[in-house]
Curated annotation (Swiss-Prot):
Family named by the database record: Belongs to the selenoprotein M/F family.
Secretion signal span: 1-19
Origin species: Xenopus laevis (African clawed frog)
Gene: selenom
Record's function text: May function as a thiol-disulfide oxidoreductase that participates in disulfide bond formation.
The protein's name: Selenoprotein M
């Protein structure tokens, strides 16, 4: 069986995001996140990730940047007690894939860095007990 070239290329573009499967049982206590990365050397070679870090990350509520010299870019998911739940490597992801992952995880994206966060999203991405991805 063969696939048409456009479909095959489309599937290949989805590969990085499909390589990380969200385990909702493990991440049910997610409350916030941070992106850890070096400030220059790694990011300058990763244009998509650098675009996300410099332009998109400031728009997300409960998501912060932490510069660590020499560190590969990772999304670190954290509980309300600052316990680490998961580390997701970002180096192989495209900017839109990182944004989609954050959306899937329930992070709220503001229209501008200074925009207010609606009351219902103040605790995002935290979910009430029993909420599922479909409830987001």
């Amino acid at each position: 069986m063969w696939l048409p070239l456009p479909l095959l290329l489309g599937l290949l573009q989805l590969q990085p995001i499909l390589s990380y499967q969200i385990d909702w049982n493990k991440l049910e206590r997610i409350n916030r996140g941070k992106v850890e990365s070096c400030g220059g050397u790694q990011l300058n070679r990763l244009k998509e990730v650098k675009g996300f870090v410099t332009e998109d990350l400031p728009l997300y509520h409960n998501l912060e940047m932490k510069h660590i010299p020499g560190a590969d870019p990772e999304l670190v998911l954290i509980t309300s007690r600052y316990e680490e739940l998961e580390r997701i490597p970002l180096s192989d992801m495209k900017r839109d894939e990182i944004n989609q992952l954050l959306k899937d995880l329930g992070f709220y994206r503001k229209s501008s860095p200074d925009a207010p966060v609606p009351a219902e999203f103040k605790m995002a991405p935290a979910r009430a007990s029993g909420d599922t991805k479909e409830d987001l």
